[in-house]
UniProtKB/Swiss-Prot annotation:
Protein name per UniProt: Sulfate adenylyltransferase subunit 2
Protein family per UniProt: Belongs to the PAPS reductase family. CysD subfamily.
Assembly information from the UniProt record: Heterodimer composed of CysD, the smaller subunit, and CysN.
Pathway the protein takes part in: Sulfur metabolism; hydrogen sulfide biosynthesis; sulfite from sulfate: step 1/3
UniProt cross-references to HAMAP family, sorted A to Z: Sulf_adenylyltr_sub2
Record keywords, A-Z: ATP-binding, Nucleotide-binding, Nucleotidyltransferase, Transferase
Organism the protein comes from: Escherichia coli O139:H28 (strain E24377A / ETEC)
PANTHER family according to UniProt: SULFATE ADENYLYLTRANSFERASE SUBUNIT 2
Function according to Swiss-Prot or TrEMBL: With CysN forms the ATP sulfurylase (ATPS) that catalyzes the adenylation of sulfate producing adenosine 5'-phosphosulfate (APS) and diphosphate, the first enzymatic step in sulfur assimilation pathway. APS synthesis involves the formation of a high-energy phosphoric-sulfuric acid anhydride bond driven by GTP hydrolysis by CysN coupled to ATP hydrolysis by CysD.
Amino acid sequence: MDQKRLTHLRQLEAESIHIIREVAAEFSNPVMLYSIGKDSSVMLHLARKAFYPGTLPFPLLHVDTGWKFREMYEFRDRTAKAYGCELLVHKNPEGVAMGINPFVHGSAKHTDIMKTEGLKQALNKYGFDAAFGGARRDEEKSRAKERIYSFRDRFHRWDPKNQRPELWHNYNGQINKGESIRVFPLSNWTEQDIWQYIWLENIDIVPLYLAAERPVLERDGMLMMIDDNRIDLQPGEVIKKRMVRFRTLGCWPLTGAVESNAQTLPEIIEEMLVSTTSERQGRVIDRDQAGSMELKKRQGYF
C-alpha cells in the first residue's frame, strides 16, 4: 500500500487495521475491551472492517461497575445485537458484595476494586492473552509513553521501564504462560482524529456526546449529571438544567460534563479545534494524586 496516496485518516485507519489483524493472527485468545465510549466505537468499527465480511474472531468484554450512564447500557446492548458480537459482561462480585460506592468509598477505591480488579478477574476467568484497548497517547502523559503492544506480567502489571522496542510496524508479542499483552490500535490517533473519523464513517455513538439540556449540579469543580436517584444532595446543592455534553464517558458520579452547544458532529469538530484542555479533565479518577493514571496502570488498569 502506497502510504503517500492515503489521507491522514486513511493512514491511521490502515495502521489500526494492520494491528488488529496482527493480534488476531498471533494470539490464541484475544479480546476487545469495550467501554462504550467514542474510542471503543471507532475501535469496534475498525475491527469489523478488518474482518469484513466475516464476523469478529474475538468477543467484546465490558467490565461493568454498575455506575455507567443508562444511555451507555442501552447503547452497549443495542450495538452488540446489531453487529452480532459476542458480548461478555463482568462485574466484580466481591465489590458488589461489599457495596462499593463512588460516593461512599471515593473514586480511587471504587476504580481499583470495580474496574482494575474487575478487569483482572475477567482476564483470568477467560484466559485472554491479548486485550485490545481504546487508549490514545494524546489523552494523558502515562499513556503517551506506552507502547502499542504493552506487556503485562502474570499479575497484569505494567512496568514503564521494561517496555519492548517497536521498530516501524514490527511488534513483539512473545509471552510466557500467564503473561499477556494490552494492545492499543488507536495509540497514534488524536481526539480530533477520532471525531473526524466518526463523522467520515458515520459511526454511531452514545447521544451523551452531543449537547442537550441535562440535569446537573456543581460539585468539586465538576458538572455532575444526575442519572438516577443514588445521590444525596449536600447543603446548598441545586440540580439545574443546563446545555452540556461529555467529552469522555465513565461512571456518572466520576465524569464531569462540559457546557456546550455542539449538537452535531461538525459542531463538535469545530469546538475541538479551539479547545485547549484535555478531554480527561472531567475524569475524577485522574485527579486522585499526582501520576494517578500511571499508578493505576502499574496495578493492572487498562
